[in-house]
């Protein structure tokens, strides 16, 4: 969930200075500093499950997996975000002059919240597509069994796939990992 903190336009340097001294995380989008609010139990559980699935599947392979607390810089938009889950090939590439901001994800996953789902699907995805290394995007619904996947096939061409049955297999071609939708939603309870 994202809640707005300020309406003043900031410079990226001001944002980065705030983040160094802040106990809370913020995203930096179009000059705005936006507080990242706490998520629901389903959001946390799904993020944790995906993180675990990827870590186990990629053990011994040249990837690092990050969940929720690793900042990503989107250079073309000069945005800073904290994706729910990222797969990053090693060696990790960091923003010049920084030791805490990644620039080369191949896979990004976002667990959708009611307040951010349109933003995650539209503006955020458009920004992520500008990252040269970015190959695959997962949008995971926390309110019903549904995973949407965008896979890059070549420059400016993406294939969309949707999964809504527990037995459906999601194939992440960018990192050669496959898992069932049912595994991702294990022990998740949907409220009416």
Stretch-by-stretch model annotation:
Residues 1-192:
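Gly/Pro/Ser/Thr-rich low-complexity, intrinsically disordered segments predominantly at protein N-termini
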